[in-house]
Amino acid sequence: MKVIIAEKPSVAQGIASVVGARQRKDGYLTGNGYAVTWAFGHLVGLAMPESYGFSGFRREHLPILPQEFRLVPRQVREGKVYKDDPGVVRQLEVLRELFDRCESIIVATDAGREGELIFRYVYNYLGCTKPFVRLWISSLTDKAIREGLRNLREGSLYDNLYLSAKARSEADWLVGINSSQALSLAAGQGVFSLGRVQTPTLAMICSRYRENKQFVPRKYFQIKVSAAKDGIAFSALSRNRFDDLETATAGLREVEDGGMLAVSSVERREAVQEPPLLYDLTALQKEANGKLDFSADKTLTLAQSLYEKKVLSYPRTGSRYISEDVFEEIPSRITLLQQYPRFAAIASALRDTPLNRRPVDDAKVTDHHALLVTENLPEGLSQDEQAIYEMVAARLLEAFSPHCVKEMTEVALSAGGEIFTIKGAVVKSAGWRAVRGEPEEEVEEATLPELQTDETLPLLASETVEKQTKPKPLHTESSLLSAMEHCGREIGDGQLRTAIREAGIGTPATRAAVIETLFARNYIRRDKKNLVPTEKGLAVYDTVKDKKIADVEMTAAWEETLAKIETGEADASSFRRDIEVYTAQIVAELLSATLDVAPSGEQCTCPKCKKSRILFFDKVAKCADVDCGFTLFRNKGGKVLTDKLIVGLVTTGRTPLVKGFRNREGRSFDAALVLNPDFTVGYSFPDRKPQGEKSGRKR
């Protein structure tokens, strides 16, 4: 028997139908000599610090550097502790039993870094030694599965891919766990999350926000003139920018005194616009955010759904090109789109046209080619799924269409010693722009009459126009994805920039999750389409902006090294040692940092140790030093103590009279709270001596 393991049940069902495994069992399908089973995402992951004997947040534990990482089943939180997910444990037992019985394994998890890691972690956790081969396909159509099964690849070919994925996973653990604990300890106020990619991304958002808000606009003035010829009116702006209205007005008077505009020059040229490349995941996410207002995470989810519905190729691709053999399939995909009403006419016209070969380059195809529609027409898509499908289909038609040809005209006019310019454009051949029929964005090109050098035109109107300089815009998800993708190009150090010029931070598959993490941590929020930091996010940024943890250059360099591990050009063990040194450095930096975040607005020193701060939480207030152990429960006698009451209690030893406590019988009473010598909390009744009572008891 051969076992095929897919990444999720829906994919396993599609593979099972192709190989004839139709008998359903608990956790797998069987038949025709196959057992087709599945994971559901990461069944196995890296153990948390508690597994290595490091409980709580303690300075003396840091940095936590396990000699060997332990693998554990995926865990769920129950109360204050994490336990193995029962469903995951059951499926792992199914996999153990199947692996024990089988002759060999066919790995059919997603053909990428994370898919490889999902299988290898399970394989290693179960201690399996059975031989395995790889099903490496770029779509889930029956045709692709059959072809992939005929061309199974040796599992060892993907050892470097696994080592890269493993190195990334361990680096994220080392940096994330240690930096988060270090900053939380330094803050003495709650728990703060940092990460290898998360924190530089937050820094990008915050630095742009600060730059935008601190920008001081500068006013300037231009002169606008209007003229007409052959019934076509047009306007032009002065090339000169005036710093003040008085000077601009003086220039305007000189222009008006002449009453005529002279055509100084007319330059005409033919402009050829190549079609855009096919989408990779990041390009799709950027355009879907700009045109549909979809988040990066939503776009990935929709693309994954279309992939599993067999109408889209593998979505987590970082390539915008296809290979020669895939190019041979493009005519049939174009023919298929003739059956799709929106694209029928364009597809029919393109079928009889030589296809543009710009997206065809074997050398630029990574693990997977660019996003394409498959040979299956979609049915029953949701409105959002249809929108993403149509974007990919339209881009396929655009990418293989002829280029767009325009005649560009630039005219210079003169009057009163000032030069005025205007640009015009006439489309001679729409080419790829005919697919969606959309005009160019952010391009102002007027329709101009036929103008000749040295001719003069009457000045019809003139005025001064007030303008002002503009800051860089706040980041949107689209612009942030671009910044994450191309940050290596922005590096100031020339030698370093050359070394990592194409490096970004994160990968196409992980960038959406990084952005969502920043939302989940309450570090950023949406303001319409813009991403803006919260007070908490800015406080974290101000603390780490000059630290290694926020260094975009360093993070981009790590990404470059991880890519080299995948190709065998770098050593995973050396990378691990470098990350451990880096982790120790950021821990030292963060432990000495000061983070000014006090969500409750109240701060006070612990009355017991008299050194650390009191942390305020929903149900308790406690000392930041876990060794001190001072804890005060907010619920006392049926009342929830406010931050102000707690501060008064721990700083003066008692509160004012509080009304409305209730005893065990439900009767109401009034009392002040007092802090006893053993640091428990008791009641002090009016005109009576204090009565000690443990803070967990009610009276």
Feature roles, as predicted:
Residues 2-3, 81, 88, 125, ...:
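Basic, low-complexity terminal or inter-domain segments flanking catalytic cores
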Residues 243-279, 285:
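Metal- or metallocofactor-binding catalytic centers and their adjacent structured scaffolds
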